């Protein structure tokens, strides 16, 4: 779900934290991508002309494989070295949000069934998209595909976006890529958004610089996490009636969620806000401060040449993809991964800071030059 309104708050208070650019600007970069988020997007977006998902001859959905294969190739063609992180077991605290999602899926399926005799194709597709969920089998198929493509992946112990951030913090990758803004709660140096679908939708990639965001918001990590919880995250409900502007104002005035809760409880008559009963905000904060992740420094990432024959067996013979296109894709992978090895020029040079010269120094320098001319 992410954090409601956070993107706009950062744009407003820390505009220098934002950059927009194209895929080619990430040449030579290694990026950790939230695989679970990608697969969900592919199942929704990769469709036939009639709006239905891609399927094999046996009727099995293959939209997730098509998206993962071709969009990963586009990244590699642009000199990017992608790796993927898959979700592990969700934290207990996320159970409420997952239950809500399941209820929404059931409601969408029921509505789809109720209107199937009278609805237009567009309406049926809309309701079908609302019911999309990534299955365990689809996750496993995506992992098999990545292995055959020579692209590394990691199974996170818990949340994929937390593991992506951990890899970025450890210096194994340049950035974490996810649509979930709560990825910033794990303090990756950079968060990339729209990475895997920017070209398809003809939109730029957003990069958020964590350090500049904190400087602009004038917050430390824990205060920022408290802001995100107050805005609304996956781990607990928020205080009703508190929108982004009010949340930012309350955090600035009181400094922490603990102080906000205390203020509301001590002043019930002077505020319209009411703290949810047994509100687990402290537990949610702890999940962000100390996420369950595998240590990034212990993870070795290795990009290899694709296993072409096995790739053809899986994608063509088992899943019904075009052999010519799969073989062509494999060649692009080989070429792209070799090209990406060249790296970036800024990886070979360090930036040297130069102090600004004082006006007096400039005058002295000019004076000495004149003396020499004489």
Curated annotation (Swiss-Prot):
Cofactor dependency: Mg(2+)
**From start to end residue, where is composition biased (Basic and acidic residues)?**
354-365
UniProt-annotated binding residues for DNA: 47, 71, 159, 232, 234
Q: Name one GO cellular component term.
A: nucleolus
What does the record's cofactor remark say about binding?
Binds 2 magnesium ions per subunit. They probably participate in the reaction catalyzed by the enzyme. May bind an additional third magnesium ion after substrate binding.
Q: Where does Mg(2+) 2 bind?
A: 180, 182, 234
| InterPro entries for the chain | 5-3_exonuclease_C_sf, Flap_endonuc, HhH2, PIN-like_dom_sf, XPG-I_dom, XPG/Rad2, XPG_CS, XPG_DNA_repair_N
Q: Which proteins does it associate with, and in what oligomeric form? A: Interacts with PCNA. Three molecules of FEN1 bind to one PCNA trimer with each molecule binding to one PCNA monomer. PCNA stimulates the nuclease activity without altering cleavage specificity.
**Function statement:** Structure-specific nuclease with 5'-flap endonuclease and 5'-3' exonuclease activities involved in DNA replication and repair. During DNA replication, cleaves the 5'-overhanging flap structure that is generated by displacement synthesis when DNA polymerase encounters the 5'-end of a downstream Okazaki fragment. It enters the flap from the 5'-end and then tracks to cleave the flap base, leaving a nick for ligation. Also involved in the long patch base excision repair (LP-BER) pathway, by cleaving within the apurinic/apyrimidinic (AP) site-terminated flap.
Know the name of this protein?
Flap endonuclease 1
**What is the originating organism of this protein?**
Meyerozyma guilliermondii (strain ATCC 6260 / CBS 566 / DSM 6381 / JCM 1539 / NBRC 10279 / NRRL Y-324)
Classification lineage:
Eukaryota, Fungi, Dikarya, Ascomycota, Saccharomycotina
Gene name, please?
Answer: FEN1
